[in-house]
Amino acid sequence: MTRETLLDRVIALLWKAEFTLSEKCDIRPRSFDVAARRGKTLLLVKVLSNIEGMSEETSQEMRRLSVLFNGSPIVIGEHTNDHPLEIGAVYLRYGIPCVNIETLHDFFIEEVPPLVYAAPGGLYVEIDGETLRSLREAKNISLGELAMALGVSRRTISKYESGMNATIEAALKLEEILDAPIACPVNMIVMFERTAKDADPSPNDLRNASALEKEALGTLMHIGFEVFHTTKAPFNALSQDDAAKMITGVSDYNEAMLKKAKFMSSLADVAGTYSLFIVKGPHRPKAVGNTLLIKSEELKQFDDRSDLFDLLLSREVKKANAGK
């Protein structure tokens, strides 16, 4: 199926799973296609037919944004370069969980988590070592006896009982011998959280910013915001202080800017943030949805960030309460 068809199916599935969704992003650049929230779970979702089409640069941006939004990234695909994605298996692409749409359905609608993850060499299962040891001892099976039945060394069985992962073939044989499940389910959300610290973004780094971005975002930094510049997202930065986050756009006033401001408003509704667009030159509307439009010259008149929040309130631009 085409990527667009797959994306539409993913969106329909997430609606069915009672997620609140942002608009579908058709703005370039885009490191994700849609944002989705259900309760405290916020997903940044990217859809690719071939998950190996995900570049390292885009993956890094998606991971950084997920940390900033307190969310989790996920890629939905159909295949790698070599083979289709297996149902019930989780693949990793630069630290981001990747699954097919059937696995997504099982996880969020049927509440059946995957049990298998892909790694170099094949498909693996995380063994519940304590359960394995308890079952073995309850059945009076020695390490040597279990090792012989499985065709591995005693040391390998000891490692399984200490939490070492096993191939899917070994895990299935262990469950057959012990007549009980020993595999731990794979939680795709927790899987990212375990490595999220590696994606911690650095604030106030404008080395790759354009001159217009440096001027506008530099003003936000001057009045007290931490600014996280983006290069692959459908907005220019995420700005924050101790109390709030703002999805931030920077542009001349034009039709493309209005389209981006509209998407940012829908994203803010889902992410539970403010949305601000700093515009160079004259503009007519004061807001697009919940995205405040402000002239760069007007922003320079502010003494501190409280002036900006006062303006947000006076123009009745709301911060979404998603997930609260």
Swiss-Prot record:
- Cross-referenced Pfam families: HTH_3 (PF01381)
Q: Which residues form the HTH cro/C1-type domain?
A: 132-189
MF terms (GO), sorted A to Z: DNA binding; DNA-binding transcription factor activity
> Which PROSITE patterns does the record associate with it?
HTH_CROC1 (PS50943)
Q: Which residues bind DNA?
A: 143-162
Instruction: Note whether Transcription regulation occurs among the keywords.
Output: yes
UniProt keywords, alphabetically:
DNA-binding, Transcription, Transcription regulation
Q: Write down the InterPro entries for this protein, in alphabetical order.
A: Arc_TR_HTH (IPR020886), Cro/C1-type_HTH (IPR001387), Lambda_DNA-bd_dom_sf (IPR010982)
Keyword match Repeat: no
Residue runs in coiled coils: none
Q: Which NCBIfam families match?
A: PRK04140.1
Name the HAMAP family for this protein: HTH_type_cro_C1
What name goes with this protein?
Putative HTH-type transcriptional regulatory protein UNCMA_15260
Query: Where is the organism placed in the taxonomic lineage, from the top?
Result: Archaea, Methanobacteriati, Methanobacteriota, Stenosarchaea group, Methanomicrobia
